[in-house]
């Protein structure tokens, strides 16, 4: 069963952080790539710390071994300097899919006792 094996590695491009540049009076979109570097199919889900300001499309999915997906991370307009942005980040969570499962994302993969890995990408806002 897939859940007894820890999920393998993923890669993200960019690797360490996401940067948005001013002005912030309009919506910005930044693309990141998530690559399944492992030898197993994974399910992934993306979380944000600020759902009012940050969005990700698609927010979840399934990746075969060595497959990649391009995600659009959007930042809605906001009053820079008047809102707390220090803890803004997106988190990629991923887990192995059960053997024989269809290539369709299922939230319950993350709710059982299988291992879930996480990678945080902090968001930096340049004035």
Curated annotation (Swiss-Prot):
Further comment found in the protein's record: Around 30 MSP isoforms may exist in C.elegans.
Lineage: Eukaryota, Metazoa, Ecdysozoa, Nematoda, Chromadorea
One Pfam assignment: Motile_Sperm
Gene: msp-10
Subcellular location: Cell projection, Pseudopodium; Cytoplasm, Cytoskeleton
Tissue: Sperm.
Modified residues (N-acetylalanine): 2
Domain MSP: 9-126
Gene3D superfamilies named among the record's database cross-references: Immunoglobulins (2.60.40.10)
One of the record's GO cellular component terms: cytoplasm
Protein name as annotated: Major sperm protein 10/36/56/76
UniProt function note: Central component in molecular interactions underlying sperm crawling. Forms an extensive filament system that extends from sperm villipoda, along the leading edge of the pseudopod.
Keywords per UniProt: Acetylation, Cell projection, Cytoplasm, Cytoskeleton
Keyword Ion transport tagged: no
Top-level taxon: Eukaryota
InterPro entries: Ig-like_fold, MSP_dom, Nematode_MSP, PapD-like_sf
PANTHER family in the record: MAJOR SPERM PROTEIN, MSP DOMAIN-CONTAINING PROTEIN-RELATED
């Amino acid at each position: 069963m897939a859940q007894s094996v820890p999920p393998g590695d993923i890669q993200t491009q960019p690797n360490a952080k996401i940067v948005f540049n001013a002005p912030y009076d309009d919506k910005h979109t930044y693309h990141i790539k998530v690559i399944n570097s492992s030898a197993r199919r994974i399910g992934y889900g993306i979380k944000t710390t600020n759902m009012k300001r940050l969005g990700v499309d698609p927010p979840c999915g399934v990746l075969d071994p060595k497959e990649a997906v391009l995600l659009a991370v959007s930042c809605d307009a906001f009053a820079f300097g008047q809102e707390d942005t220090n803890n803004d980040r997106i988190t990629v969570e991923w887990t192995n899919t059960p053997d024989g499962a269809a290539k369709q994302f299922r939230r319950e993969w993350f709710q059982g006792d299988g291992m879930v890995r996480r990678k945080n990408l902090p968001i930096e806002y340049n004035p």
